[in-house]
Amino acid sequence: MSGSYPFIDIAALDSVREGFARGDAQLVLAHDLSTVLWVNGPGAKLFGYNRVEDLIEGQLDLPVATRRQIAAFSSENTSAPSAVAVRLGGGLRSELTHLHVSNIKLPDGVAALLVATQMPDNSAEAAISGLGDDSTHIALVDAVGKVVAASPRFALLDISASTLEDLIVEAGDATDRIVKRRIRTGSHSVPGAIARLTDTPALHLLCIVGDAPAQFQTAAEAVPLPDNAEAVLEEILPEQGDAPAQQAQKTHAEQPRPKTFAFDHDAPPARFIWKVGPDGTFSEISPDLAAVVGPNSADIVGRRFSDVANVFGFYTDGSIAALLLERDTWSGKRLLWPVEGTRLRVPVELAALPVYSRDREFLGFRGFGIVRPAEAEADPEEIGLALAGGIPQNRKPRKEPAETARMVGEDDVLALSEEVANDDQPAAVLPKPPLDITPTPGRRDSDKVISLLNSCAQEKVAADQAKFLKEKERATRPEGGLTKTERNAFREIAERLRKQGLANTRAESETPVSETSSIEPVEPTPPVKTRSEPIQPDETALLANLPVPVIIHSGDAIHYVNQALLDITGYESLDDIRSAGGVDVLFNSESDDGETRQSMVLRHADGSEEPVDAHLNAIAWRGGRALMLSLMPVTAADLPAPAELPAANDEEKQALEAHVEELKTILDTATDGVVLIDPEGRIRSMNHSASALFGYERDEAEGKFFSMLFAIESQRAAMDYLHGLSGNGVLSVLNDGREVIGREAKGGFIPLFMTIGKLPHTRGFCAVLRDITQWKRTEEELTNARKEAERASNQKTEFLARISHEIRTPLNAIIGFSELMADEKFGPIGNDRYRDYLRDINRSGNYVLALVNDLLDISKIEAGALDMQFEAVSLNDAIGEAIALMQPQANRERVIIRSSFQSNLPDIVADSRSIKQVALNLLSNAVRFTAPGGQVIVSTSYELNGDVVMRVRDTGIGMSKSEVEQALKPFRQINALEGRKAESAKDWRNEGTGLGLPLTKAMVEANRAQFAIDSNPGQGTVVEIVFPPTRVLAD
């Protein structure tokens, strides 16, 4: 697919990817409305094209009306999609289509237009229709790596399920939702990319670039032919009109030949990567393993771990197979891997960790291994020789998909290749001069090809024979039993001995290897000598003649010492050293004061000591592994000069001692206990306060473990605190102390707060312990007081709830019968006074019922048990309902209620029932305490700082500051009569229970709002309720 932008980059855009996954028709246009920058398959089909390539980077000829409608939207600076109804097609086949047009930003920031519409077919196959060709392959993959839909040639890529799972995980972790890298197809890799289109359910778009048949051609490294190979081939295969012969010549020249594997003993350890699936099948292994053990030995991809283990004889206890089933991290597992073409096997150490998908689905193990060729040992089963069998007889050469004719002389070439590959021993042949081929009538061209390959094979065998002779000569050298590293070590030691005069100068002469002009027939190749075979007597003689002390040991067991070590230590034999204590008696790494020495010290038989330098090497010994320790005496010139300490006079010493005593006195005076601890966790000393705190004498506690000072439940916490400070972790920086329980000598317990610090020079610790008994007692008292207050509040609430229930039942009966009698439904009462009495009974009953309800509400609010349901509440609507309820009462009192509500007032988060109750209480008080002809004004506003404010203003009698404070207290009324109203006026303040304002204020605060009241005698009252921005649902 061509285009200025990669197809997958635009498909992964946030404004495109979900519609692409749904199968919508999508088209990205430049602002000229003619150039198509990107289109998917349904989009190309919508505009009459079968393939995406036919439209991308092309010119789209839209109708004039459609272009005008889209241009009108493109001028708007908005990213929201706009619906446009256009007619697509022409003549009688035009259809009205609803398009959604939106402004988008391309990956490079260029603005463009996205035109999209839903299609009737929203299947996965429709989403990728029109995509993919011989060089481009498209697929939709779900969350578990299953291919939902794909282009026709996608299956030829042979991408494994594990590779798809890895791509899905990488795409989920990518910030831009796209991963571009080379993707493994079969045994090779090709460029590709994957994009995560949707999350729920997860769907991914996978794009592969490359010709599918070409991806299956083996790109092996070709074996170079001699310089005159082209000339020889031209003589063998002259230009003819026979097309099959020419094709065979070309195929033979291009066919790669595998390299011969040769095991390298002295190669360093190699690290390789491996991966197995959930069923234990190898899905990937890096070529580093094949470079050490051979390609056939490392060819395990597609095979189960248990099968490979059974064939190669890795293990017998099945421990690794059990670890693969546990799905946990493991490491340090050692096995022996056979080496191709040899009788050896090399140790391999494996480690692995489990791999999970984003949905916590187990995907298998990823791990690494370390193969150590230098530690190869003999394989009794000789599996490596079976792995070097060459090309099997029944194996057919793979044909390329485009080839139909068989190569000329192919059977003969394969037969010769098998003969050379299966030849385990070098043949006694001499190199021949370049082959001189003359045309021979009746001779097949394939015979000529065989002769050429035979010449090359003979030269290769001769080279292998020369290499074998060179190895044999090297095996006869005096130091042949030692590795290159060990020989270099001995030469370095000898050089140092010559410089110090401890050894005579010896000339090291090596007989040069003469080159033979001809190669004689040789005996069959002897078995390769492994490094695990025992050291030969000539090597022991070499060690015995060295003037350097040498010890060969394994752990504490000494296998061999030379005469130089016996001479320098004074022991008679190796048995004397073993009976004296072995390796431990020979070396002393600590000085008399317990400090670690900077150099190793060799202890003699008479107890004297001598500093030495040591050099350690791993060697093969008696069929196993051992360590060879070579020692070099350190002369006085090599030792560091002791530091000269300034002599302290008596006055400085006395001043220092006085300072120490002063510090001890200060510690003993402190009220906190101070305990010094050594690095092993034992008590070094403690001050008087600590001794009195725990009841131990100083000498009684010294030398005992620090944990003895704590109760059993606090010992673990105290020691964890101490161990955490011993390192350089977080505790050593963020040292905030611990609360622990101390244990007295007599068995009592003390609450303590402990802080531990590190001592700089002695590597010990200092613990400061403070008695927090009084703090704990005060904390317990406060906790009990709070619980008691909560219990009393709950009892009051429960009492009021019961009283309310008991009072409501008879009150409802009294109110109901009074209303029934006042209506005279069963006959006339006959007296107006009785009717007045009935009205009084009804009014008093309602008053008592309201009082009980207010008591219950205020008790619930104080206890925090009021059931409130916070939701979006329209404050204007709530106040409007309250005004409607109070309007009849205001009319009777001849009080005017006026309202001023702000339009577009945002909703608030509050309890709808309590907000209406607050509005009713405020309006009721305002109407009640306002004289006839007065006004009550209710208003709402939306402040600039985001507050929503409700105000209730009246022109009533007002209150002073002291009266306001008294009115806000429960069950308090303003009883003082002042002369600021006419004597004939009604004393409204003697009505009510004194719960109106306190209950209103409590409900306002329960709704997370602020309540304020401002009143002046004779001027009226203003009540203001403010809802903060956190309780306002602003747009």
Swiss-Prot record:
Reaction catalysed by this enzyme: ATP + protein L-histidine = ADP + protein N-phospho-L-histidine
For this protein, the Enzyme Commission number is: 2.7.13.3
Q: Please give the chief subcellular localization of this protein.
A: cytoplasm
* GO molecular function ontology, one term from the record: histidine phosphotransfer kinase activity
**Protein's recorded name:** Cell-division control histidine kinase PdhS
CDD domains attached to this UniProt entry: HisKA, PAS
Assigned keywords, A-Z: ATP-binding, Cell cycle, Cell division, Cytoplasm, Kinase, Nucleotide-binding, Phosphoprotein, Transferase
Q: Describe the location of the Histidine kinase domain by residue ranges.
A: 802-1031
Assembly description: Interacts with DivK.
